[in-house]
Amino acid sequence: MDSQRNLLVIALLFVSFMIWQAWEQDKNPQPQAQQTTQTTTTAAGSAADQGVPASGQGKLISVKTDVLDLTINTRGGDVEQALLPAYPKELNSTQPFQLLETSPQFIYQAQSGLTGRDGPDNPANGPRPLYNVEKDAYVLAEGQNELQVPMTYTDAAGNTFTKTFVLKRGDYAVNVNYNVQNAGEKPLEISTFGQLKQSITLPPHLDTGSSNFALHTFRGAAYSTPDEKYEKYKFDTIADNENLNISSKGGWVAMLQQYFATAWIPHNDGTNNFYTANLGNGIAAIGYKSQPVLVQPGQTGAMNSTLWVGPEIQDKMAAVAPHLDLTVDYGWLWFISQPLFKLLKWIHSFVGNWGFSIIIITFIVRGIMYPLTKAQYTSMAKMRMLQPKIQAMRERLGDDKQRISQEMMALYKAEKVNPLGGCFPLLIQMPIFLALYYMLMGSVELRQAPFALWIHDLSAQDPYYILPILMGVTMFFIQKMSPTTVTDPMQQKIMTFMPVIFTVFFLWFPSGLVLYYIVSNLVTIIQQQLIYRGLEKRGLHSREKKKS
């Protein structure tokens, strides 16, 4: 096998990956609107959701920090809108990215409250609580590091329930603390719940990823337990009423999309019930309900949980809850993508530019792989040197395939040549390439990250297609510089058009990935010349002009 056959193998592997990727794409069918709420779950979160009367909406209050702009409904204390000021909606846009939304076209909310026998969010106890607040807008002031938003509700029996949102400067983790004051003569049985609900089908103005075949990242629910560190749960599975219903001590539930996530992390010593639910009308939910606790008469009970609402910043997420950083969708090659991203981030801490960081990491990766590359070219050179003997053998033995196979193996053994030696290094390179693809698609740090000149977003395609064309040119030079023994006309035609085929494929790929491939090809050209010089000295290569 020679260099040009390697290009053919790369193309076949690449196309196979794209076909598999398209097949794996999480395209959820839009469910028919259901007017009746599903009864396959007994989770308190979904019951609380159903308990909100249409005519009993509370008022909306604004809560702002340097990184979060939340809108909270005093009816139940749900977060109905979340804007992220540090992340523009689009490149060069003044509008912040909106993660949570409540509109006629799309629902995505973070709900929470107190259920159980005596909880105010239990539908059996009437509408969800209408909390009282001191003001309609809360803003984290300059020099202030923490913002508290207390909300109080007193039921007919005189019991007081306080729900306090605690936000910190520069933090996307929101603590939700509950205090229950029992003014009665009997114990109160209380459970906490946290629920994330979202429209299964994205409206056209949000469904930007489906127009680009290269942008395939997971959108759906996920959860973590001590036994299962990270498990995805597809929206279409929830739509089919195949619902989650497990008990866990610790863990979290979440909803994910490219670059951003929301998650509820319960904080208690007991067991939590993790569930999913089809709420009808094309809305899916994932949530938790805690084990009930008793608040004795005259006593105060405290419960709390944490809501993550923001970008998937791995180190910050890992500090909030174990394995929460796994929500970054690096696909099945996460074990390669994660170390690569850590290395890329370390390089960026010195360079300050993600594009130059990609260039440097490309040199590092190709440098580490140089021994494999050298072994690959050496093996191919030896195979080329054996071609005259192999051809003579075929002419001598005619159609006796068994004899040909036996004598070829004997020849390989005598000459100490591994016929698969040219393939193995190639198979090692492909997972690294795919891992880089997943890393660029899943790392929010690279979202809208500029490089230089016309490249203002490394996570988006080149607007002028200059990088893909340059990539095709480098492939063409590699092809022309590589010796070949391919005689089959069809293979020759395929390899002739290979740079064009790859260029077309890469038109829609993120600029960062194309940049990596260009630099990798340039390194290949340099390494190729160094290796060929060494092979010439050993008599394994000749710089005679390639036959056209």
From Swiss-Prot:
Drop me one GO molecular function for this one: membrane insertase activity
Q: Where do the TM regions start and end?
A: 6-26, 350-370, 420-440, 458-478, 499-519
Is Transmembrane one of the keywords UniProt gives this record? yes
Q: Supply the Gene3D superfamilies for this chain.
A: 2.70.98.90
One BP annotation, GO: protein insertion into membrane
Q: Where in the cell is it found?
A: Cell inner membrane
InterPro entries per record: Membr_insert_YidC, Membr_insert_YidC_N, YidC/ALB3/OXA1/COX18, YidC/Oxa/ALB_C, YidC_ALB_C, YidC_periplasmic_sf
Q: Which Pfam families match?
A: 60KD_IMP, YidC_periplas
- Primary site of residence: membrane
Stretches for region Disordered: 28-55
The biased composition feature labelled Low complexity covers 30-50
Alphabetical GO CC annotations of the entry are: plasma membrane
Q: How does it sit in the membrane?
A: Multi-pass membrane protein
Q: Which UniProt keywords apply?
A: Cell inner membrane, Cell membrane, Chaperone, Membrane, Protein transport, Transmembrane, Transmembrane helix, Transport
**KW Cell membrane (keyword) present:** yes
Its biological purpose is as follows: Required for the insertion and/or proper folding and/or complex formation of integral membrane proteins into the membrane. Involved in integration of membrane proteins that insert both dependently and independently of the Sec translocase complex, as well as at least some lipoproteins. Aids folding of multispanning membrane proteins.
Tell me its family.
Belongs to the OXA1/ALB3/YidC family. Type 1 subfamily.
Quaternary structure, per UniProt, is: Interacts with the Sec translocase complex via SecD. Specifically interacts with transmembrane segments of nascent integral membrane proteins during membrane integration.
| Protein name (Swiss-Prot/TrEMBL) | Membrane protein insertase YidC
Species this protein is from: Escherichia coli (strain UTI89 / UPEC)
Gene name of the record: yidC
